[in-house]
């Protein structure tokens, strides 16, 4: 059984209220898969990371020993199993042809979205690439809202009009379908935090395949020039589509790509290292040190997208080795057992509850209606409320939309 935290309401006006109401029905705080919090869950526990967890560039690496609470460790485990179950549901729905078009899974990479979110606050902003399902969930969207969007349903986070690559949530600026295009937007989010004197930073994530894009380096330059609180995060999952990193990049130490920006390489398969590095990066940027480049070394178990089997450019033995030796969920489970935070039976109960919850969310998403077959939908959510132009042209003159009338300008 799942108990959900209350989600605070979001304030909006006019047509944005429709967006907020639609989203709020599908939003919840981070899941608490257990029925209740056990006594002592707020007790501090000592975490000792291996020396191989970090490698620094122009900075001293974070402390390898730190303290966190039992409840925080349990929450990260529960979050990761929800994200994985959600991605597995995506795979099944895609094979059933209920999800169509592009769809990119993050199975194997769950530690990054979960570790970052548990290390930052809701004041901070996140933007990433098209592999964004887990980030959307972690920023506050319910599983059913993510899945409904992937299936093109009206109750999706983008009302069924965005699909897999264009998911949004409060404080989460997408999903971006253009390789590397989210990085300058992430720098812009950091500029907004700085301009408004907020104690917050932005996390802009991109893959090793996007790391050679010119706009990434342009963003580095501007962020350093203006000393922005920007955390640039390379999710190095070893392959850009089907191309190994060494075949596309002259230098594969992506954490050093900032040149004049300090960097940190992180074991992205260990959520305890991801969590510590993400907290370190946030503290670094909001303390006035300017931007930082993180490289999360990770691995995707599946192909680049659902249509890619993922075995033509790497061996099955390689994939199995990563699954058996480096799985982030299995790694955290081992720590929970060793630290006495959870028993095998309790972990099995969490896994069972996560499976049940995601199955229920799949049913809700699948039962949701598709967007109405009417042209007026095309003119919704185009402008920030209050900034609309008087009219917006359609394909033909009679398709021109009048925002004041909320109908077509030249139709009776």
From Swiss-Prot:
Its cofactor is thiamine diphosphate; Mg(2+). One of its GO terms (molecular function) is pyruvate dehydrogenase (acetyl-transferring) activity. One of its GO terms (cellular component) is mitochondrial matrix. The keyword Ubl conjugation does not apply. Pfam families: E1_dh. It is an enzyme of class 1 (oxidoreductase). It catalyses: N(6)-[(R)-lipoyl]-L-lysyl-[protein] + pyruvate + H(+) = N(6)-[(R)-S(8)-acetyldihydrolipoyl]-L-lysyl-[protein] + CO2. Keywords: Magnesium, Metal-binding, Mitochondrion, Oxidoreductase, Phosphoprotein, Pyruvate, Thiamine pyrophosphate, Transit peptide. Thiamine diphosphate binds at residues 130-131, 177, 179, 208-210, 237, 304. NCBIfam families: PDH_E1_alph_y. GO terms for biological process: pyruvate decarboxylation to acetyl-CoA. It is found in: Mitochondrion matrix. Tetramer of 2 alpha and 2 beta subunits. Its main location: mitochondrion. This is Pyruvate dehydrogenase E1 component subunit alpha, mitochondrial. The pyruvate dehydrogenase complex catalyzes the overall conversion of pyruvate to acetyl-CoA and CO(2). It contains multiple copies of three enzymatic components: pyruvate dehydrogenase (E1), dihydrolipoamide acetyltransferase (E2) and lipoamide dehydrogenase (E3). PANTHER family: PYRUVATE DEHYDROGENASE E1 COMPONENT SUBUNIT ALPHA, PYRUVATE DEHYDROGENASE E1 COMPONENT, ALPHA SUBUNIT BACTERIAL AND ORGANELLAR.
């Amino acid at each position: 059984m799942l108990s959900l935290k209350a989600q605070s309401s979001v304030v909006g006006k006019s047509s944005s209220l429709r967006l907020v109401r639609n989203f709020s029905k599908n939003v919840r705080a981070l899941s608490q898969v257990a029925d209740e919090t056990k006594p002592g869950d707020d007790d501090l526990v000592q975490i000792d990371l291996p020396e191989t967890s970090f490698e620094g560039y122009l900075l001293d690496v974070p402390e390898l020993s730190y303290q966190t609470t039992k409840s925080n460790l349990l929450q990260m485990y529960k979050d990761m199993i929800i994200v994985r179950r959600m991605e597995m549901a995506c795979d099944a729905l895609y094979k059933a042809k209920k999800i169509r078009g592009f769809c990119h899974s993050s199975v194997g990479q769950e530690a990054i979205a979960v570790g970052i979110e548990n290390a930052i606050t809701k004041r901070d902003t996140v933007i990433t690439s098209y592999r964004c399902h887990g980030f959307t969930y972690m920023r506050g969207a319910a599983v059913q809202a993510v899945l409904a969007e992937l299936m093109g349903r009206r109750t999706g986070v983008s009302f069924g009009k965005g699909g897999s690559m264009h998911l949004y949530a409060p404080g989460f600026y997408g999903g971006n379908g253009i390789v590397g295009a989210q990085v300058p937007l992430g720098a812009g989010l950091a500029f907004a935090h700085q301009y408004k004197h907020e104690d917050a930073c932005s996390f802009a994530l991109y893959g090793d395949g996007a790391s050679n894009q010119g706009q990434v380096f342009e963003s580095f330059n501007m962020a350093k020039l203006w000393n922005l609180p920007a955390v640039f995060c390379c999710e190095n999952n070893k392959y850009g589509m089907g191309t190994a990193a060494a075949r596309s990049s002259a230098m594969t130490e992506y954490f050093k790509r900032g040149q004049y920006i300090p960097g940190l390489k992180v074991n992205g398969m260990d959520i305890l290292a991801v969590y510590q590095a993400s907290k370190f990066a946030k503290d670094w940027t909001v303390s006035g040190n300017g931007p930082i480049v993180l490289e999360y070394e990770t691995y995707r178990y599946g192909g680049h997208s659902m249509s890619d089997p993922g075995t033509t450019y790497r061996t099955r033995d390689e994939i199995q080795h990563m699954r058996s030796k480096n799985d982030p969920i299995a790694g955290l489970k081992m720590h929970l057992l060793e630290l006495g935070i959870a028993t095998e039976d309790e972990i099995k109960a969490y896994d069972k509850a996560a499976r049940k919850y995601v199955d229920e969310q799949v049913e809700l998403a699948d039962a949701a209606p598709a967007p109405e077959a009417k042209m007026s939908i095309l003119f919704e959510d185009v402008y920030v409320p209050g900034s609309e132009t008087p009219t917006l042209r359609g394909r033909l003159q009679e398709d021109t939309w009048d925002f004041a009338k909320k109908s077509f300008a030249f139709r009776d």
